[in-house]
Design a protein with these regions (language model features):
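N-terminal Sec-pathway targeting helices
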Residues: 1-12
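Preference for long, amphipathic alpha-helical scaffolds in soluble/luminal domains
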Residues: 16-46, 50-429
């Protein structure tokens, strides 16, 4: 495969579920789908191609892959999958020089996670904070710029929000780069003091961690109450194109559809980080903070289920077409991102009490959570046979974003599986 065609396929599969179905078929017809891979993309034939029933339905567009039948996976299987992913991502997530990596380690392993140098990840993060003067003349703490392979804090307020998400005490003492002693509360107060409400698309894109943070501190609660309906309306507007789609699932992202255009142009929900799933999680946290009724949240959760069906159908079709192609690895990496973040999002809604798992609607949502765990198993099995996690050093040097996705999205998948476990417990009672 020449470099141009190889590059085209990187874009196509890297933008999985973005209208690539017809493009991959075109490359298949033209004979440009196969070819030798680089050190970072060479792979065996994936083992997790979807079952024939799933790929058939995806190819015909009649439905998305059916949820697994009860009993296909048990809670113990989900825990084993969680632990297996953990074995693969722990080293990368413990990078003592990357606050971003350590924050993802905290997400996956909890507040007592250790950095690669043996200290608590929270302490390793704190030691990279540097002091400066803020616009208001007050002392400000921030992270120095990271590197491509060891990001620092790519999204505003990411680190402090994660500390609170995983249960770090706001009173905990942090020792900074210059030896100063501050508390987690210092970082919270700094964020709440300096952050403005989102008012344009760029600010909305970077807003999830601030919005979630507002729900976790008493001083942020009034703003959370005020922003909850605004944020929910914004989410509804940006997912409307999903509700509007009426075609076959496997055709949802074909060239010419509104979903294809939104994904290609990074607009509406697809303009946000990780497909808008962080934004939806923040919106759910805001809704829970104002004690929103499950009935008011249900329409948006229904859109999420529809989106899962549409994207699953496209992933299944692409997996069928690219089976055995070296760069199919990128498809599985994108699947790890989507299914992991989606399980994390739907599981958060359950955790926050935004749906009742004993009702018929709640049982449907729990079934979707269990199906997402099955999706993650197929994806991880494919990556395991592909050897992606065994080749992390080569991937890191050649395709650093793929490396970061394997680590970061693996951590989000772990939290998604943790949040999905109660849906399995419900069926096993």
């Amino acid at each position: 495969m020449n470099q141009r065609n190889k590059g085209v396929l990187y874009v196509l599969i890297g933008a999985a579920a973005a209208g690539v179905y017809l493009e991959v078929k075109r490359h298949e017809r033209e004979g440009t789908l196969h070819g030798p891979g680089s050190a970072a993309t060479a792979s065996a034939t994936p083992s997790a191609a979807p079952p024939s029933s799933a790929t058939t339905s995806a190819a015909t567009g009649t439905s998305s892959a059916p949820p697994p039948q009860a009993g296909e996976l048990k809670g113990s299987d989900v825990q084993a999958l969680h632990d297996a992913i953990g074995e693969r991502v722990r080293k990368g997530a413990s990078d003592a020089g990357s606050p971003w990596a350590l924050a993802h380690g905290l997400i996956a392993f909890g507040k007592d996670f250790k950095a690669s140098d043996g200290q608590d990840a929270v302490d390793a993060i704190a030691k990279q904070l540097v002091k400066s003067k803020g616009p208001d003349g007050k002392t400000q703490w921030s992270f120095p710029p990271g590197s491509a392979a060891a990001p620092s804090e790519p999204h505003p307020h990411l680190i402090v929000d994660v500390l609170l998400q995983v249960g770090v005490n706001p009173k905990r003492t942090l020792v900074t780069q210059d030896g100063s002693k501050i508390s987690v509360q210092t970082l919270i107060d700094q964020a709440l003091r300096g952050a403005q409400d989102p008012s344009n698309e760029v600010e909305w894109m970077d807003s999830p961690w601030l919005l979630d943070l507002l729900t976790r501190d008493p001083k942020g609660k009034p703003r959370a109450t005020r922003l909850a309906p605004i944020t929910w309306r914004k989410l509804s507007e940006e997912t409307q194109l999903i509700a509007d789609y009426r075609g076959a699932p496997a055709a949802a992202f074909e060239n010419g559809t509104p979903l294809y255009a939104a994904k290609r142009n990074k607009t509406q929900i697809y303009g946000h980080h990780c497909g808008g799933l962080h934004f939806m999680q923040a919106a759910l946290s805001l809704e829970a903070s104002v004690n929103a009724a499950p009935a008011s949240v249900a329409p948006e959760l229904d859109r999420l289920l529809k989106r899962i069906a549409l994207e699953r159908a496209t992933y299944n079709a692409l997996a069928n077409m690219t089976q055995g192609v070296p760069i199919s690895r990128l498809l599985w990496v994108q699947g790890l991102k989507f299914f992991g973040h989606t399980a994390e999002t739907l599981g958060l809604a359950r955790e926050l009490g935004l749906y009742d798992p004993t009702t018929s609607e709640g049982k449907r949502l729990d079934a979707a959570l269990r199906a997402l765990a099955w999706d993650l198993k197929r994806v991880f099995d494919a990556l395991a046979k592909d050897g992606a996690y065994q080749q992390l050093d080569a991937i890191k040097s050649e395709r650093v974003q793929t490396y970061l996705d394997l680590i970061g999205d693996g951590c989000h998948a772990m939290r998604g599986l943790t949040r999905a476990l109660p849906a399995f417990d419900q069926t096993e009672k």
